[in-house]
Amino acid sequence: MVSVGTRAWRWSRQIAAPFGELDCALFFERSLVKPVPLPANSLGASIRSAEETDLDMICQLYAGDAWLWLGNGPRDETARGLYLDRLRRGERCFLAFVDGVLAHVNWTCFTWGDALPGHPIRLRPGEIYTTDAFTPSPFRGKGMHALVLGTMLAEARRNGAQHAYTLGQLDRPDAHKGLRALGWQECGRVLYFLPRGAARTSFLCRYGMTEPLFRD
């Protein structure tokens, strides 16, 4: 059953839709001081870092998801350049394949990453930011996100990272459960409104620990 709060939130977003996007971002953190347990690889997936030649495949997946896609529409070719810039500045994209089929995409950022519209997260030494996780529908519910995320965190820890951050959406509770199961804790929320046609959001309310999102 959908809660009253959820219905009210959906109604608020519908009311705001003609004027822009009303959204609530959940900010999560996780310590990397202790070893990161790796989930089981039940599908026998292979995981590797993406290369520039993989970008067309990655963009094809992201283009249908407005939360992940960095373009203004599914055919916005400038988005590819933004993902290319990520790779060239040293951020890492992890790809998981099952029997040669792409089963998951995820990113680890070490310097800065796209977070709230027009407000990137600026990272300090020892911090990482994971973002833009995507699992194609045939592989959802099969542990791919947990497997790749665990691999990313473990590798970052081996390379000296001590703290990780990520963002979630209020209306994706299943994803929040998965993060908490992997040791993440919600530490803050940001309510914001992005006017139609704008590139930078206006903040309506924020609470909890959100400081890393506002270092710019």
What are these regions (language model features)?
Residues 181-183, 197-216:
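Charge-rich, low-complexity intrinsically disordered segments
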Residues 157, 174, 196-198:
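Short secondary-structure boundary/hinge segments and terminal tails
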Residues 66-127, 131-138:
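A conserved beta-strand-loop-helix scaffold within acyl/acetyltransferase catalytic domains
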Residues 28, 185-200:
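Conserved catalytic-core motifs of GNAT/GCN5-like acyltransferases
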Residues 1-61, 68-73, 78-82:
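Acyl-donor-binding surface of acyltransferase catalytic domains
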Residues 156-168:
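Conserved GNAT acetyl-CoA-binding A-motif
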Residues 9, 170-189:
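Conserved active-site alpha-helix within GNAT-family acetyltransferase domains
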Residues 132-135, 141-157, 181:
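Conserved acetyl-CoA-binding loop-helix of GNAT-fold acetyltransferases
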